[in-house]
């Protein structure tokens, strides 16, 4: 349904991820669940060469076309392409957002590494739902208790009953970032792989941000960018590693779960 809505609202040559993004947002707006006069949308804007740069424009066009021109769209970018009145983000906001991403990455690791081997069908998903609610409460409290939360999550998944004598083929999932991570965009590929007898392996979303920071080193060495930009990129990598240190620490202590590696 989201794809259909997106295709109706976007121009004909829009890429598949943009159809999904616009379709999801418009589906939510027209669902009746929200007061459209007290609603705002936020979307990242990269400024790069691909159509991800046009997402904000696509969304605004779709809103106007559907009769909701009053709904503001906040363009979130590191470069500061737009000034968004009424929206202020600071380091506390960024830290909380990155902690949320770290928890999401952790959930992918603990669920995908255990669910194919669970002794009691549905036990891993039940455990996931339990800790998902706990994670939401943690984020609503500004990330307080983040370190204890991730250690408790790993400990609980370390003790879920598994068929330890079975080893399934591991299949890595790669591709465009939205399609890779969003189940409704990739036809629930993880579940399909598990149904076919495989263990799905998904890269961390935080690793994508690290790759973006690491790019500054390449641009400095080969494309004429400044040494300062490379240094700032390395500082960004160090900041992300420090932020997800509790996750890495908890996974290193695990008897069955694998931690992420440094870029």
PLM feature segments, named:
Residues 88-263:
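A charged, amphipathic alpha-helical module
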Residues 8, 40-45, 172-175:
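Glycine- and acidic
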Residues 14-31:
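Glycine-rich, highly charged phosphate/nucleotide-binding loops
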Residues 1-6, 11:
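Single conserved hydrophobic/aromatic residue that forms the stacking wall/gate
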Residues 15-16, 45-57, 175-184, 207:
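Gly/Ser/Thr-rich loops at beta-strand to alpha-helix junctions
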Residues 21-26, 56, 149-155:
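Conserved alpha/beta core surface patches that mediate binding of polyanionic ligands
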Residues 27-89:
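N-terminal glycine-rich phosphate/adenylate-binding segment common to multiple enzyme folds
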């Amino acid at each position: 349904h989201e794809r259909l809505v997106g295709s109706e609202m976007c121009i004909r040559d829009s890429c598949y991820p943009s159809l999904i993004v616009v379709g999801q947002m418009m589906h939510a707006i027209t669902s009746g669940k929200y007061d459209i006069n007290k609603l705002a949308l936020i979307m990242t804007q990269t400024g790069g060469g691909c159509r991800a740069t046009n997402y904000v424009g696509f969304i605004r066009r779709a809103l106007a076309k559907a009769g909701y021109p009053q709904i503001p769209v906040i363009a979130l970018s590191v470069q500061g392409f737009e000034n968004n009145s009424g929206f202020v983000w600071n380091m506390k906001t960024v830290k909380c957002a990155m902690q949320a991403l770290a928890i999401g990455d952790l959930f992918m690791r603990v669920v995908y590494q255990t669910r194919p081997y669970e002794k009691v069908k549905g036990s891993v998903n039940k455990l996931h739902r339990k800790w998902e609610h706990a994670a939401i409460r943690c984020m609503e409290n500004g990330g307080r208790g983040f370190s204890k939360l991730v250690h408790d999550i790993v400990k609980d998944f370390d003790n879920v009953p598994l068929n330890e004598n079975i080893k399934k083929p591991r299949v890595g999932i790669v591709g465009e970032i939205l399609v890779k991570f969003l189940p409704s965009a990739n036809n629930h590929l993880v579940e399909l792989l598990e149904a076919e007898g495989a263990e799905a392996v998904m890269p961390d979303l935080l690793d994508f941000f690290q790759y973006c920071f690491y790019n500054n080193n390449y641009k400095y060495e080969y494309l004429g960018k400044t040494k300062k930009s490379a240094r700032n990129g390395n500082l960004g990598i160090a900041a992300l590693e420090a932020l997800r240190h509790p996750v890495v620490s908890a996974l290193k202590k695990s008897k069955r779960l694998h931690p992420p590696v440094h870029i």
